[in-house]
Every structure is written in structure tokens, then in C-alpha cells.
Swiss-Prot record:
The lineage of its organism: Bacteria, Pseudomonadati, Pseudomonadota, Gammaproteobacteria, Pseudomonadales. One of its GO terms (biological process) is protoporphyrinogen IX biosynthetic process from glutamate. The record marks 97 as: Important for activity. It comes from the Bacteria. Pathway: Porphyrin-containing compound metabolism; protoporphyrin-IX biosynthesis; 5-aminolevulinate from L-glutamyl-tRNA(Glu): step 1/2. Belongs to the glutamyl-tRNA reductase family. This is Glutamyl-tRNA reductase. It comes from Pseudomonas aeruginosa (strain ATCC 15692 / DSM 22644 / CIP 104116 / JCM 14847 / LMG 12228 / 1C / PRS 101 / PAO1).
Length: 422
């Protein structure tokens, strides 16, 4: 038995490669079942996000070559392409990796809270697929428990430093009371979703989501009581927008200086806070030259992120120590589980011997034998049978000079005297 954690992430693979190794939600159940059917994986779960694709496995041997081959084949990569950017962690290292990931210690943004929810979703999907059993299930539960401890006992989750958090925190600096502010969000991807959530939690007066497709904008808007519009309707919304945050995949700017200038006139030059998170940029840089416009780029936000990260290094160290404790505790429990089957078999053997001797005693009593003698014979017989196999093995070990095994037997039976002598 071995635990394996393997995959690629933002540190080992480019976006182009990560896109090729990503699993869509629609693929997940079938992929998990195929993984367990075609490889030596007995239990499996898959975590697939924009920054990582990882497989968590309970496998019957300590290598994962067949799993890497399956992953490459599934996504139509060559094995060499995958090996060039993949990592494989085994047993204690695999446990540590999972706990670090769930705690946000392996994330692009240190301590980001979304990853724990994503890992819980991966576990839920694996359960739905029927590919999680008792061992991997215990590891996930221990991982969630450790991540929760990290969140509650350290400051790793305080003053979040994701780009979305940074954008909203800057907005709070510009507008002291967000309850009176209206926001226009351009795009409907993961980052804009996070921005929408943070603005909603801050009680922003009104949120408008603009996207290339109205369906996608509506799906996001429904989550936060927002209003959905098409990109073509942005000029009509600009004049009412105190906050504009954009993150799309457009190759050309969506907002130009002229459109913003016209909106400012309608606003009577009331300040407008704008954040362009997109690469390439959604908002023409010249917009920042306008009075009453506070325009920030993704690079500006990264400076905020980097500054906040410095203050969280102490929290990160404390989190690493908690992860270490979580790993040690889980590995100890895992080792204890290894004794369960042996203890169960030993108990069954003892109960069988007990039943044999008890049946013999009951027959003797039925035939009128002296109860005291029957009890004595029962005790002697049970003692002899229970000691027979261990006695034979200890004599054999002694003859072979296995003093260490005899010392272990003494510890096993909690004997105070009769220690083996060299």
C-alpha cells in the first residue's frame, strides 16, 4: 500500500500545458473510474483548478509509472512532455503535499481560501464516482482537519492578498462607504466571480456584470443579486459606476479614453475607481491620465499583494509547523491501522480456541464430571493452546539467535523478567 500525490501546477508548468492537463467537471467521474480501472490505483481523487491538476491515489505499489502514462494518454500528451513538468510525492511526502495544498501554502497566492473548497469538491466527486475508499477517505478528512486548524490557529487567512481581495481593498480606500457605491464588473471568469463575492460581502449598493455572452453574465449575476448586461451595453452603465473592475480574455481593449471621458462628464466628475486585471489590458492606459480616475493595473495590485505577503511570512511558518503536526498524527494513525488486521485475526484465533475448550468442558459436565476438575482442565487447556504457537516461534527465534525478536516478544507480552541475554 502506498499514497501517491502527482500532478502539475503553476510552478512546474506553463498555462499552455496546464490547459492541456485540466479536467472539466463533465469529465471527472468517467476519468476517475477509468483511472482505477486501467491502472493499479485502488482509490483515487482528482483536483483540477486553473493553477493545478493533481491526482491523489492509494496504490498497491510505491511507483506511479502506469498512472503517469494514463494521464499523458488521457490528455494526449507524450509521456516525456508530462514527465518534464510533473511531480510525484509518495506516502508521508504525499500526505504533507495534500495538507499544504489544502492550507493554501502551495498556492500562487499564499493562504488563499478557495483551494480548500476546491479540494472538498474533488473529494465529493470522487465519492460520487465510487473511487474513494477508507484509506484515501481518512487522508482527506485528516487533510481538511489540518487545513481548518491552520485557518483558525494562524493568521494565514487574514488580510487576504489575492488580486481580487487587493482590488476590493483598494476600492475601500477610495470610497470609505461601499454601501453607497455601484460597481461594474467586466468578464465572468473566476477572478471576477471572486471580486463579485467580496463586493457583495462589503454591501455594495449595486453590481452590474458585463460579459460577451449574456448567459454567462446572468449565471454570475444571479449569485449576488446583480444585473447582467452585454459588453455592448457598457457605455450606458459607465456613468453610474463608481467602481469598474475588468478581467476578460479579449485581445483588444474594451474601454477607451473617450468612453470614460464621456461617462465622467455625466457623473459631473465624481471619482471613478478602475482596476484592469486582464493581460492584455482591457482598459486603455491613457484612461489613467484623466482627472478623477484612479486606474490600477494588475502589476499595481501585485505590489499590494507582495507587500502583504511580507507580513504573513510568520503566519506561513506557523502554518507549516501545524501541517507537520498533522502529517505526524496521520502517519501514526496509519501505522496503528496496520495492526488492526493482525489483532482481528489473533482475536478470532483466540476465540476459536476458547470455544473448543469451552465445548469440551460443557460435554464433560454433561457426563457428570467433577466441576472443579473440569474448570481446572479448561484453564490448563486454554492456557496451553494460547501459548503453543508463540512458544514454538520463540524457541525457533532463540535457536536462530534472533535476540532482537525475543526482546520484542518480551515487550509485546509486557514481561518484566526473563529478558533475553546475549
Amino acid at each position: 500500500m502506498a499514497f501517491i500525490a502527482l500532478g502539475i501546477n503553476h510552478k512546474t508548468a506553463s498555462v499552455a500545458v496546464r490547459e492541456r492537463v485540466a479536467f472539466t467537471p463533465e469529465q471527472m467521474v468517467e476519468a476517475l473510474q477509468q483511472l482505477c480501472r486501467l491502472t493499479t490505483s485502488r482509490e483515487a481523487a482528482i483536483l483540477s483548478t486553473c493553477n493545478r491538476s493533481e491526482l491523489y491515489l492509494e496504490i498497491d505499489h510505491p511507483t506511479a509509472d502506469d498512472v503517469l502514462a494514463w494521464l499523458a494518454d488521457y490528455h494526449r500528451l507524450t509521456l516525456d512532455e508530462l514527465r518534464a513538468c510533473a511531480y510525484v510525492h509518495q506516502d508521508e511526502d504525499a500526505v504533507r503535499h495534500m495538507m499544504r495544498v489544502a492550507s493554501g501554502l502551495d498556492s500562487m497566492v499564499l493562504g488563499e481560501p478557495q483551494i480548500l473548497g476546491q479540494m472538498k469538491s474533488a473529494y465529493a466527486v470522487a465519492r460520487e464516482a465510487g473511487t474513494v475508499g477508507p484509506l484515501l477517505g481518512r487522508l482527506f478528512q485528516a487533510t481538511f482537519s489540518t487545513a481548518k486548524t491552520v485557518r483558525t490557529d494562524t493568521a494565514i487567512g487574514e488580510n487576504p492578498v489575492s488580486v481580487a481581495f487587493a482590488a476590493v481593498s483598494l476600492a475601500k480606500q477610495i470610497f470609505s462607504d461601499l454601501h453607497r457605491s455601484q460597481a461594474l464588473l467586466i468578464g465572468a471568469g473566476e477572478t471576477i466571480t471572486l471580486v463579485a463575492r467580496h463586493l457583495f460581502e462589503q454591501g455594495v449598493k449595486r453590481i452590474v456584470v458585463a460579459n460577451r455572452t449574456l448567459e454567462r453574465a446572468s449565471l454570475l449575476a444571479e449569485q449576488f443579486g446583480a444585473h447582467a448586461v452585454l459588453l455592448s451595453e457598457i457605455p450606458e452603465e459607465l456613468a453610474n459606476s463608481d467602481i469598474v473592475i475588468s478581467s476578460t480574455a479579449s485581445q483588444l481593449p474594451i474601454l477607451g479614453k473617450g468612453a470614460v471621458e464621456r461617462a465622467l462628464k455625466q457623473r459631473k466628475h465624481k471619482p471613478m475607481f478602475m482596476v484592469d486585471i486582464a493581460v492584455p489590458r482591457d482598459i486603455e492606459p491613457e484612461v489613467g491620465e484623466l482627472d478623477d480616475v484612479y486606474l490600477y493595473s494588475v502589476d499595481d495590485l501585485h505590489e499590494v499583494v507582495a507587500e502583504n505577503l511580507k507580513s504573513r511570512q510568520g503566519a506561513a511558518q506557523a502554518a507549516e509547523e501545524l501541517v507537520g503536526s498533522g502529517v505526524a498524527e496521520f502517519m501514526q494513525r496509519l501505522r496503528e491501522l496496520a495492526a488492526v488486521d493482525v489483532l482481528r485475526a489473533y482475536r478470532q484465533q483466540a476465540e476459536r480456541l476458547r470455544d473448543e475448550e469451552l465445548g469440551k468442558a460443557q460435554r464433560q459436565l454433561a457426563n457428570g464430571a467433577d466441576p472443579a476438575e473440569v474448570m481446572a482442565q479448561l484453564a490448563r487447556g486454554l492456557t496451553n493452546k494460547l501459548l503453543h504457537a508463540p512458544s514454538v516461534q520463540m524457541k525457533k527465534m532463540s535457536a536462530e539467535g534472533r535476540i532482537d525478536a525475543l526482546a520484542l516478544a518480551q515487550e509485546l507480552f509486557a514481561l518484566d523478567e526473563g529478558a533475553p541475554r546475549h
